[in-house]
UniProtKB/Swiss-Prot annotation:
Protein's cellular compartments: Cytoplasm
Leader peptide range in chain numbering: none
Assembly description: Heteromultimer composed of HisG and HisZ subunits.
Alphabetical keyword list: Amino-acid biosynthesis, Cytoplasm, Histidine biosynthesis
Function (record text): Required for the first step of histidine biosynthesis. May allow the feedback regulation of ATP phosphoribosyltransferase activity by histidine.
Family classification: Belongs to the class-II aminoacyl-tRNA synthetase family. HisZ subfamily.
Name the record gives this protein: ATP phosphoribosyltransferase regulatory subunit
Nucleus is among the record's keywords: no
Further comment: This function is generally fulfilled by the C-terminal part of HisG, which is missing in some bacteria such as this one.
Keyword hit for Amino-acid biosynthesis: yes
């Protein structure tokens, strides 16, 4: 099987590389305009580093072993690596820290799904050491601008708040609370409806929680009628302020769905949590995800000092799929500007020199040498098929012929 990549791996051919590079370059340009600096972290991390934040499970990580028998893994996401680097290597820099990345990540497929994709490409940002509504608004508006600059044809944001949802879950007994939470995270209404509730009031509350999604104003009006503890009331007020802030900060109304059932099975996010959703061929695509994680930086800090953080990652593959049906992406690999042809073996030196001079005169030009000793008709056909703009014929002792 040496002629095939391993199960779950794939090659990117030149056109796809050019298209995904365009996506990445566009995103990095937007990140830069907002003041984010690129960081590059190691592809390989210690397994305990990857798992320390509580969001990564052993079976997700493609594990490696080195000669020192350390347990290592290929990164399944970037946030843990960026957080580790920020608190250990950048402690003396000014705050907040605005960091961005473009990188590949690796994840084992779920059990029973052998052959599923293992390697993915992400671009994203982390806004570290800054809390509050204004920082949350910056991240949501940055996601929106990224999707607009890419000209994604149809997209919207799903926004939740992990703190508020935890408060809404607090009346449930501990064991039942975890079951309800899992049903919300996995969108399993059948199981949710059949759980053993101590009374009808809690069963009704669970059903209401499952359906707390829709237009922000509609969802918020329902939440006001629910019993909330002080933490929940604080989260609700912050969420109202955030929605008002982002809606009055743009020339358009942000396509926003509020979903208070949006929660993970693990306690990773502490504040807002969101997803960017696109649509292609009547199929929804998860374009990206993110949220606030105010406990993560403290996990990696040598003195365990907590600090706020928020970020998101965009899935380059999903963005690419959404744009394939449009004419926005480059439709051809990068074309050759000049094909320099040595008409005889004696003129090869002149051909090489001529090509080198073209590159020197204009470093944006793409110049190649014909290597195949083809006749004139074959060379013209080759140039036409490959979109080569200009052929230069070189013959020793004669002036170059350009056509």
């Amino acid at each position: 099987m040496i002629h095939q990549p391993p199960a779950g791996a794939r090659d990117l051919l030149p056109l796809e590389v050019v298209q995904k590079a365009w996506i990445n370059d566009t995103l990095q340009q937007v990140f830069g305009q907002w003041g984010y600096q690129r960081i590059v972290t190691s592809t390989i991390e210690r397994l305990d580093t990857l798992k320390a934040g509580g969001a990564i499970e052993d079976e997700t990580v493609i594990q490696l072993h080195n000669n020192s028998r350390e347990q290592l893994g290929l990164r399944p996401e970037l946030t843990a690596s960026v957080a580790r680097a920020a608190v250990t290597r950048m402690a003396n820099t000014s705050y907040p820290q605005r960091l961005c990345y473009r990188a590949n990540v690796f994840r084992n497929p779920p059990s029973g799904h052998h052959g599923r994709q293992l390697e993915f490409y992400q671009a994203g940002v982390e806004l570290l050491f800054s809390g509050g509504t204004l920082a949350d608004a910056e991240i949501l508006l940055l996601v929106a601008e990224c999707l607009q600059k890419l000209q994604i044809p149809s997209w919207y944001l799903i926004l939740g708040d992990a703190g508020l949802t935890r408060s809404l879950l607090s009346p449930f007994p501990e064991a039942l609370r975890q079951e309800v939470r899992h049903c919300l995270a996995t969108l399993d209404y059948v199981k949710l409806d059949n759980l053993s509730y101590p009374n009808e009031e809690l069963k009704h509350r669970a059903s209401l929680l499952f359906n707390l999604r829709g237009k922000p104003e509609d969802v918020l009006s329902k939440v006001v009628d629910l019993t909330l503890d002080q933490t929940g009331k604080h989260c609700l007020n912050n969420l109202k302020s955030l929605i008002e802030l982002v809606n009055h900060s743009t020339s358009y109304k942000l396509p926003l769905t509020l979903d208070l059932s949006l929660i993970q099975t693990f306690d990773y996010y502490t504040g807002i949590i969101f997803k960017a959703i696109g649509q292609t061929n009547h199929k929804l695509q998860n374009l990206g995800q993110g949220g606030r994680y105010d406990q993560l930086l403290g996990v990696y800090h040598p003195q365990k000092k907590s600090a706020p953080g928020i970020g998101f990652s965009l899935n380059v593959g999903a963005l690419h799929r959404c744009l394939l049906s449009t004419d926005i992406l480059p439709q051809k690999p990068l074309l050759i500007d000049y094909l320099v042809v040595a008409k005889t073996s004696e003129s090869q030196i002149e051909a090489l020199k001529y090509a080198q001079q073209l590159r020197k005169d204009d470093n944006s030009l793409r110049v190649t040498i014909d290597l195949e000793n083809r006749n004139e008709e074959e060379i013209k056909k080759y140039a036409q098929e490959n979109g080569i703009k200009t052929i230069v014929w070189i013959e020793k002792g004669k002036e170059a012929i350009i056509n």
